[in-house]
Amino acid sequence: MDFNYNSNHLEGNTLTYGQTEILLLFGKVIGEADVRDVQEMTASNVGLRMMSEEASVKEVPLTQNFIRTLHKTLLREDYTVYRELPGGVQTSYVIHAGQYKTRPNSVITRYGDRIEYASPEETPSLMTDLVDWYNKAEQEGKLSPVELAALFH
């Protein structure tokens, strides 16, 4: 309950703790609530259960397919992002649920520096490397689950 509420609240979800509790325990919404917030909280709960179930089966290694399925569960559906480029030019692109990115992405820090992330072309092989590293590290058992999760994240 706490994880779902806090995680979604950090992302801007407006459901109160009480609304979250009633939604996740009884599948009902009390008071006024944004439909998207309800859908996001519900999807988050399903995703958390998926991860818990997957983690409970130690013999099953992490796979890229599971990561993409989890992504599709959390996003629920494809959606369009609208952006304004320098000079006021409008652009848009589609984020595909359950698929690796199809276009470059970056962030601009509060100091104005741009940080570029892996290109769409690099992403599949980098994900292979990440999943292979994770499975090897988990099998070796040298890291605690918290350390492993923190490094993976």
Task: Enumerate the predicted regions with their spans.
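FIC/Doc superfamily catalytic core
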Residues: 1-153
